[in-house]
UniProtKB/Swiss-Prot annotation:
InterPro entries: Colicin/pyocin_DNase_dom_sf, His-Me_finger_sf, HNH_nuc, Pyocin_killer, Pyosin/cloacin_T_dom, Pyosin/cloacin_T_dom_sf
EC number: 3.1.-.-
Additional comment: Pyocins contain N-terminal receptor-binding domain, translocation domain and C-terminal DNase domain.
Protein name in the entry: Pyocin-S1
CDD domains in UniProt: HNHc
GO MF annotation list: endonuclease activity; signaling receptor binding
Subunit annotation: Purified pyocin S1 makes up a complex of the two (large and small) proteins. The large protein, but not the pyocin complex, shows in vitro DNase activity.
Function: Causes breakdown of chromosomal DNA as well as complete inhibition of lipid synthesis in sensitive cells.
GO terms of biological process kind: cytolysis; defense response to bacterium; killing of cells of another organism
Pfam families: Col-Pyo_DNase, Pyocin_S
Cysteine pairings via disulfide bonds: none
Length: 618
């Protein structure tokens, strides 16, 4: 008697579980915030399926073409239901898995938005890598099982092939075939689940990437705005500094032909007895010098004014330190002998010079500076004076000249003249006329005219910078001679190393280039700041007098003078007129950029040799 079907075919339950790793953004959404965490998902067919042992369906009167497909259909349905359930829970599983991964990294509340996104991108990237690996494993599984389309195969097709396999290779082959079919179906559904998980993760990755790009773009825009603002600030600051430097180095004068002294960046220096008295004092000095030279030609100087600093009367905004006050004096160049026929424009274009029989000089002594007219001989006092042409600046309404500095660290000098009216080619009716500001008065210094008294100049004169300024023909302004403060009267620090000396140091002072500054003296003076050239010179000779070796080379008379800051005497054959002491010579002229206090630029020479050097003698 045939057994019931239930006794012949039975099913053990097939366990299907969820597994997988997925990531998403904040709270399952797409914004920036606490990001989601991974969940393991996928179908697992590793448990035994419990297929009915195969003997011979014919022996029990069962048609395998009918009942095997029923068994397969039931198995496939169970797997499909598990897949559908896992698919419904996919997004929640993805979110939970991402939340778990994020929590493992600790709180993100103190992180910047960009750091939160970068952290999220790392988590999602890791999840994508894991899912792609599992997707690949399931795809390989399908390939190993014959690369069939397990999702579309019919139960009848599977049953027929399973029975055929069993009839040929026995019951175990039959059950292995059905196991492989279910493994393949499970792998196929896993491929779908992992593909969907990867798609979900990729959406999150794209969202986070876009958010990162937005934050970075905003940061870049902010950085550009800040850079532009900083560049603008620096440009404005530089413009202010340049304007301040320009103002501090501008000598402003009226263009009325009067004799005026002006302090750079401050204004006109007041004259104790009025401007007319200063002009008269210069005229008297020139006349006295002319009479003296007519009877006994030589290098003579005639003082005409003294400049004193009176900080007690200076305004608070004005610099009250005499050492830092730079000044210039301007006067009619014709009074110093400028030939009326000279073409100043042509000379200036050629960067040339014009010889003058007289020039101005100044010498600081303590808090007072003496201004003098000095005769020129081409040797002790050069005749050549550089020429510059002034140009009208329609923006400022001033005539201006810019004089490049002779040293790299110093800014250029700017001279301005305020005309009584615009030049002839400027039509005041066509535009709003520029009204220049009146030149202010500097109350921190006073010029006092003195009686003209001639004296033989006691040395080779290192003249301050001076210029002859020409003006356009339509300006109505006569050529002006301008003398600047002697650069040797400007404070400075000693530099240079000097040279080692031995034997009779000043023996070289009467020949060749002269005697170098001894290195041991340079070591003592280097780095010290001196009020002016006179201050340096005095400290130099005091240092020499106190040197145990060098002091042995001088007689008691010279040593006494040197200890008071004076220079030692020279023998009669090396004297020149009233010049009887050792002199210090700048190898490169100060006017040519030679350092005033650069001890490598200084040599000690006798008066006779000094004159020969200036004559070009070897």
């Amino acid at each position: 008697m045939a057994r019931p079907i239930a006794d012949l075919i039975h099913f053990n339950s097939t366990t299907v579980t969820a597994s997988g790793d997925v990531y998403y953004g904040p709270g399952g959404g797409t914004g920036i915030g606490p990001i989601a965490r991974p969940i393991e998902h996928g179908l697992d067919s590793s448990t035994e399926n419990g297929w009915q042992e195969f003997e011979s369906y014919a022996d029990v009167g069962v048609d395998p073409r009918r009942y095997v497909p029923l068994q397969v259909k039931e198995k496939r349905r169970e797997i499909e239901l598990q897949f559908r359930d896992a698919e419904k829970k996919l997004e929640a599983s993805v979110q939970a898995e991402l939340d778990k991964a994020d929590a493992a990294l600790g709180p993100a509340k103190n992180l910047a938005p960009l750091d939160v996104i970068n952290r999220s991108l790392t988590i999602v990237g890791n999840a994508l890598q894991q899912k792609n690996q599992k997707l690949l494993l399931n795809q390989k599984k399908i390939t190993s099982l014959g690369a069939k389309n397990f999702l579309t195969r019919t139960a009848e097709e599977i049953g027929e092939q399973a029975v055929r396999e069993g009839n040929i290779n026995g019951p175990e082959a039959y059950m292995r075939f059905l196991d492989r079919e279910m493994e393949g179906l499970t792998a196929a559904y896993n491929v779908k689940l992992f593909t969907e998980a990867i798609s979900s993760l990729q959406i999150r990755m794209n969202t986070l990437t876009a958010a990162k790009a937005s934050i970075e773009a905003a940061a870049a825009n902010k950085a550009r705005e800040q850079a532009a603002a900083e560049a603008k600030r620096k440009a404005e600051e530089q413009a202010r500094q340049q304007a301040a430097i320009r103002a501090a180095n501008t000598y402003a004068m009226p263009a009325n032909g009067s004799v005026v002294a002006t302090a750079a960046g401050r204004g006109l220096i007041q004259v104790a007895q009025g401007a007319a008295s200063l002009a008269q004092a210069i005229s008297d000095a020139i006349a006295v010098l002319g009479r003296v030279l007519a009877s006994a030609p030589s290098v003579m100087a005639v003082g005409f004014a003294s400049l004193t600093y009176s900080s007690r009367t200076a305004e608070q905004w004005q610099d009250q330190t005499p050492d830092s006050v730079r000044y210039a004096l301007g006067m009619d160049a014709a009074k110093l002998g400028l030939p009326p026929s000279v073409n100043l424009n042509a000379v200036a274009k050629a960067s040339g010079t014009v010889d003058l029989p007289m020039r101005l000089t100044n010498e600081a002594r303590g808090n007072t500076t003496t201004l003098s007219v000095v005769s020129t001989d081409g040797v002790s006092v050069p005749k050549a004076v550089p020429v510059r042409m002034a140009a009208y600046n329609a923006t400022t309404g001033l005539y201006e000249v810019t004089v490049p500095s002779t040293t790299a660290e110093a800014p250029p000098l700017i001279l301005t003249w305020t005309p009584a009216s615009p030049p002839g080619n400027q039509n005041p009716s066509s535009t709003t006329p520029v009204v220049p500001k009146p030149v202010p008065v500097y109350e921190g210094a006073t010029l006092t005219p003195v009686k003209a008294t001639p004296e033989t100049y006691p040395g080779v004169i290192t003249l301050p910078e001076d210029l002859i300024i020409g003006f356009p023909a339509d300006s109505g302004i006569k050529p002006i001679y301008v003398m600047f403060r002697d650069p040797r009267d400007v404070p400075g620090a000693a530099t240079g190393k000097g040279q080692p000396v031995s034997g009779n140091w000043l023996g070289a002072a009467s020949q060749g280039e002269g005697a170098p500054i001894p290195s041991q003296i340079a070591d003592k003076l280097r780095g010290k700041t001196f009020k002016n050239w006179r201050d340096f010179r005095e400290q130099f000779w005091i240092a020499v007098a106190n040197d145990p070796e060098l002091s042995k080379q001088f007689n008691p008379g010279s040593l006494a003078v040197m200890r008071d800051g004076g220079a030692p005497y020279v023998r009669e054959s090396e004297q020149a007129g009233g010049r009887i002491k050792i002199e210090i010579h700048h190898k490169v002229r100060v006017a040519d950029g030679g350092g005033v206090y650069n001890m490598g630029n200084l040599v000690a020479v006798t008066p006779k040799r000094h004159i020969e050097i200036h004559k070009g003698g070897k």
